[in-house]
């Protein structure tokens, strides 16, 4: 028999766990997808968002700032990275489609949000057997600062700088970029990310659930 899993959130990505939580008095079970990540011959798993670029750069810097704690560390790391504003060159293959170029950020979402409620892949559905990809083009620092607050509502995807895709197998290659998943360091690219449908059976708590935190996202038409 398959065991169901649940969790007690204890780190910075509380919003992701709130999304998965529902029915403390009347518990329910749900089978959800997971992402299998292969880096340097090692396989790891993710239920949420996998990222490269600015997000992973911020995490790398924050992990070195051991004299600060909590959100202060990540805020200072973000400000430092925005000042340096490095760009990485990527080759990303989504199923059979390849894209090459510079990007500020690449996110691959099974779940759609991370980092305190940032909806980086707002249309991600953890039960559809697909991964959502968000690619952010290079832009002046001032433009990026204006774009950043829109991530909390998911409206950043309306910007011409942001491109969204969907696929079941994604490879990310870059000469100098790290991969992070669910806030944890995975390793350097190249990385192969594959969705495994309905592999995780989870126990959910209805008490904390709201319609906007549903597993199932209504699909909107995309250009």
Label the model's feature ranges.
Residues 65-66, 121-124:
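Short, surface-exposed, charged loop/turn segments at secondary-structure junctions
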Residues 1-103:
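Catalytic core of DAGKc-family lipid kinases
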Residues 51, 55, 107-121, 185:
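Glycine-rich phosphate/pyrophosphate-binding beta-alpha loops
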